Every structure is written in structure tokens, then in C-alpha cells.
């Protein structure tokens, strides 16, 4: 079917994902969702926006910035219709580049008979004492500013779909393409005979702290990321979490107490099922359509000061959950009870916190088990410095502190994703430091 269209099927499965390139700078992710949503139902969208500030630093002051997006449709026919009519849907007259769309192909490394367990490690045992985030020592800073989204450097972590598949038979070489935000990737590893350890495949960070003790035992690192749908945990005969929630078979509370029942039909990956407290997706059609219809109300989304993207809902069992209007994901309230209290106790006894501990505060104290928020902020979490989180006279943490980022976009994203987040019976208030302008990066 549709043999004339390249990659319209992947291993016999109809492709529903489109990789759209050369999106004009005036077309935001909200506009793109609205335009394409008129043609077909959009299940998911990843919008990769290049910052003008970053481009200016690379002497591209007079160059237009064209963006890229990965869009997942409900059916193959809808994706095909958009692909054929993309130039009519999005006006690119007067632009330097013509918009281009093609079926997306998973960027999968095929390493037959290779049991390398470090294939998807984002940070690989970097010593925080010697780490310079602005350089390439972490394979982060230099690649974040890179314009080459199709190169062989680690920027492939942000460009998940290209037509290059590596055929690497070297068992000693580490593949750093972690597919950081691959969403709903079904049949991704059908040709891969590896029996990789899932806890390492889904590891977002593997830092070596000052005491050289790795974070491999941190519960957060062994949990599947909400954007990483590792379909090794589901077979073709089992319903996924989204379908079960949509059909009313499970609630947010049910997610945590009965998560082991999801994988009863899978005999290949039973060793990590207890760590699958995944942030469930809210796929109800009315919520998605509501998001697409509210184009005008979301046009000012970049004005993030004081904006809360979290809304409180109740399911049919009167269980409270929280829905994020931007990421279209929801959190069950009892997930917050999984906080690592031993880590909190240790931090309360400390008189001050250094850079490593502040990073650990974000990843463990606030969002331990909350891979949703951690994934949102980890892409921009490049902290330059911080001030101590002060405590009151009674010895209780006031929850007050300053964190500085290396660029404006990172600070704005931190505000956008964290402000209004419900944790420890309070709503986080994240905003620019008083007296600071948008040019400054304190939040």
C-alpha cells in the first residue's frame, strides 16, 4: 500500500508519523497543531524550536530560523493526506525554504548479538567536579547550540527520526543516541535481537557525584520516562495504559496499585515491571480537540510569567489528577507520596547546597517518580549557580530559593513547566526574580 511513498510502512505496519522540516519561524507549535488538526486528529506532536539567541551566538544574526516537528496522527490515511497537501496547508510564500514533510523513520541502532546495557545513557558517569556545561564534555552544551540536526553528533538526541540506521557490530562502542523524547514508538525494536537491561535503556542520567557514588539505585532513574513508550513491556495482545484509562478500566489511583497487571502477558521483560509507574497519557478526544480549538487563547503562551499550565480534574471514582495543557499529560495525586524521604532528611541537615545538590533537588525532592516534570525541565536544566534554599526559624524548609540558567529560554521553560505544579500539598510558584528583566536568566 502506498509503495510510491517512502517509508509509508515500517516492517509492514502503516506509518502514522510525519517528520516536517523547514517550518517558517512565524508558525508556532500551537499554530501548527491548529492547522494540521483541521485535516486529521493529532495524537502527539514534538516541536523543535531553535532559539534566536543561540543562533546569534553562532553568528547567524541575519538568518531566518526554520523549525522541525514530529507529528503523530490517529490513522495512516490522515498522515498521508497531510503529507500530500502540506504545502497547501502551510503558506510558505516569500520564505527562503519550502516546507517539507515525509514519513518519519525511527533512528534505531541495530546491534545484533550485542548486550551493551549503556546504549541509552544520557550523561555517562560525568564527574560533576570537572564538568563544564558550556563545553562539550557532557555532550550537551556544544550540541544544544548546534544547527546540524542531521549530523552524527549527540544532537541526534533531539532529532529522533532520520533515514540513517547505524549497523555497528563493535561490542565495545557505546551508542549515545538515547532517543530522549521518542513518543508512542510502536514496533521500534522489532529487528533488534538485543536483550538490553530496561533500567539502563531508560536511564536519563548516570552522574558520578563528588563521593563517586552513582545514582543507579535512585528509583527515579529506573522508571520509564513518560515520553519513552518502551513497547518491550507490552505485547500485541495486551492493552496499553492509554487504552485502559480511556476505556474506564483503570483510574490514576489504579495506575500505581495495580501496575504489575499491565504486563502479565509479557514473558520477556519481567525484571523491571515494578518500576513502570509511568505518567499516564490523557487521550480523551474532547481534551485534545479542546486544545486544538483554543488557538487564540494560547497564542501568548510565551508570556510565561505567572502562567499555570496545570488544571485539576476528578475521574469517575472521584480521584484527583492533574492535567497539563501544554504537554497533554496527567498525573495522579498519589504519585507524589513516592518521594524519597531519606534524601529529603539528608538535605534538611545540610547547611548549604552546592550545584550537584540543587540538581538533585530538582530530580529527586520535587520530582522523584515524576518523570513528567523531570523530562520537561531536564532538556533546559543547565544551572550556572544558585542561592541556598533558606529555612525558617522553626527549621522548616520555606521552599524559597534562586536558580540561574545560562540562557533566557531555559529560564522561561522552567517557569512554564514548573509554575502551578502541585507537590507536597502546595502549588509551586515559579517566576522571574523581582527586579530582573527578561534579558536576565534568574528564576
UniProtKB/Swiss-Prot annotation:
For this UniProt entry, the molecular function terms from Gene Ontology, in alphabetical order, are: RNA binding
Ranges of Low complexity composition bias in the record: 256-277
Which parts of the sequence belong to the RRM domain?
A: 16-106, 342-435
- Coiled-coil residues are none
**Organism superkingdom:** Eukaryota
> What is the name of this protein?
Clustered-asparagine-rich protein
What InterPro entries does the entry give? Nucleotide-bd_a/b_plait_sf, RBD_domain_sf, RRM_dom
Keywords noted in UniProt: Malaria, Repeat, RNA-binding
* Residues covered by region (Disordered): 253-279
Amino acid at each position: 500500500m502506498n509503495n510510491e511513498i517512502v517509508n509509508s510502512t515500517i516492517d509492514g505496519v502503516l506509518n502514522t508519523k510525519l517528520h516536517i522540516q523547514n517550518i517558517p519561524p512565524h508558525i508556532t507549535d500551537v499554530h501548527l497543531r491548529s492547522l494540521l488538526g483541521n485535516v486529521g486528529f493529532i495524537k502527539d506532536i514534538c516541536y523543535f524550536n531553535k532559539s534566536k539567541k543561540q543562533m546569534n551566538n553562532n553568528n547567524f544574526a541575519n538568518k531566518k530560523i526554520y523549525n522541525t516537528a514530529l507529528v503523530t496522527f490517529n490513522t495512516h490515511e490522515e498522515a498521508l493526506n497531510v503529507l500530500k497537501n502540506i504545502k497547501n496547508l502551510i503558506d510558505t510564500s516569500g520564505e527562503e525554504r519550502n516546507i517539507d514533510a515525509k514519513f518519519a523513520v525511527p533512528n534505531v541502532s541495530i546491534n545484533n548479538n550485542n548486550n551493551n546495557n549503556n546504549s541509552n545513557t544520557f550523561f555517562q558517569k560525568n564527574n560533576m567536579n570537572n564538568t563544564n556545561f558550556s563545553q562539550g564534555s557532557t555532550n550537551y552544551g556544544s550540541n544544544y547550540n548546534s544547527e546540524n540536526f542531521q549530523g552524527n553528533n549527540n544532537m541526534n538526541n533531539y532529532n529522533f527520526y532520520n533515514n540513517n540506521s547505524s549497523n555497528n557490530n563493535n561490542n565495545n562502542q557505546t551508542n549515545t543516541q538515547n532517543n530522549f523524547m521518542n513518543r508512542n514508538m510502536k514496533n521500534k525494536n522489532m529487528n533488534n535481537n538485543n536483550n538490553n537491561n530496561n533500567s539502563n535503556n531508560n536511564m536519563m542520567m548516570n552522574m558520578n557525584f563528588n563521593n563517586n557514588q552513582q545514582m543507579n539505585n535512585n528509583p527515579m532513574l529506573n522508571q520509564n520516562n513518560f515520553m519513552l513508550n518502551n513497547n518491550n513491556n507490552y505485547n500485541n495482545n495486551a492493552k496499553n495504559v492509554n487504552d485502559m484509562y480511556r476505556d474506564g478500566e483503570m483510574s490514576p489511583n489504579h495506575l500505581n496499585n495495580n501496575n504489575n497487571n499491565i504486563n502479565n502477558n509479557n514473558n520477556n521483560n519481567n525484571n523491571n515491571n515494578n518500576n513502570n509507574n509511568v505518567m499516564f497519557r490523557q487521550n480523551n478526544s474532547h481534551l485534545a480537540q479542546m486544545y486544538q480549538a483554543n488557538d487564540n487563547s494560547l497564542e501568548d503562551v510565551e508570556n510565561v510569567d505567572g502562567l499555570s499550565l496545570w488544571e485539576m480534574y476528578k475521574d469517575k471514582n472521584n480521584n484527583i489528577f492533574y492535567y497539563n495543557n501544554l504537554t497533554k499529560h496527567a498525573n495522579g495525586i498519589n504519585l507524589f507520596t513516592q518521594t524519597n524521604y531519606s534524601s529529603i532528611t539528608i538535605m534538611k541537615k545540610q547547611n548549604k547546597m552546592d550545584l550537584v545538590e540543587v540538581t538533585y533537588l530538582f530530580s529527586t525532592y520535587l520530582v522523584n517518580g515524576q518523570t513528567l516534570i523531570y523530562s520537561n525541565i531536564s532538556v533546559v536544566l543547565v544551572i550556572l549557580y544558585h542561592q541556598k534554599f533558606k529555612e525558617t526559624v522553626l527549621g522548616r524548609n520555606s521552599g524559597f530559593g534562586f536558580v540561574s540558567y545560562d540562557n533566557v529560554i531555559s529560564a522561561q521553560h522552567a517557569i512554564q513547566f514548573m509554575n502551578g505544579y502541585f507537590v507536597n500539598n502546595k502549588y509551586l510558584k515559579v517566576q522571574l526574580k523581582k527586579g530582573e528583566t527578561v534579558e536576565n536568566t534568574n528564576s
